[in-house]
Amino acid sequence: NKEILTRKFTTPLTTAANKLYNVTEFKAEDLSSGMDTNLRAYLLSEYDANGDGLLSQAEAESVTEIYSTGFGGKVKSLMYIERFPNLEVLVVNSNCDELNGITLSNNKKLTRVSLSPANGLWSSLNVSGLENLTTFELKFSNDQANLSKINLSNCPALKKVVVEGAKSLETLDLTGSASTVEMFWLQSCPKMTTVDIQEMPIN
């Protein structure tokens, strides 16, 4: 009847529906969810454009640079870093000595990766297939580093490779990457016996 048709709702429709179907209140997607606490705080401070305490898809796509100077403490994990498809620069220095795992092969726009000290890294590091990567720097500061393999294959724009203090490093794969390297620095890596640098343009 007319009374029902003209009646105003005093309870928001979404709230009423939630009660009817016994579901929790809908929340917008947060692409910073589950990330390392200090890294998440940094991302929200730099890229949360509307200040709602969440990272929307659009805000995640605006992330192009991550610098450790903005972190409030140490970063133990870079899990979910693949959520930022436009990330170009990743620099985590002095805050990542407990960093234990990282995969960057899905961040296709990366041009620079710098991690120091990365003492907690696991046995292997995959940075392969990054067509825009020009600079890779990885440094360790103690004798307990367990990293034994670095995969830098198929990075055709690579110009600078720096690896220091990787006491357990045995394999550095530069297949499909070596021909463009202009600076290659390998220091204090006693278990590293062979590196194929035939493609490198070294005089």
Residue ranges and their predicted role:
Residues 123-125, 146-150, 171-172, 195:
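Beta-strand-rich extracellular passenger or scaffold domains
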Residues 72, 93-97, 115-120, 138-146, ...:
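Extracellular beta-strand-rich, repetitive "passenger/adhesive" scaffolds
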Residues 1-31:
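Extracytoplasmic cysteine-anchoring/structural motifs
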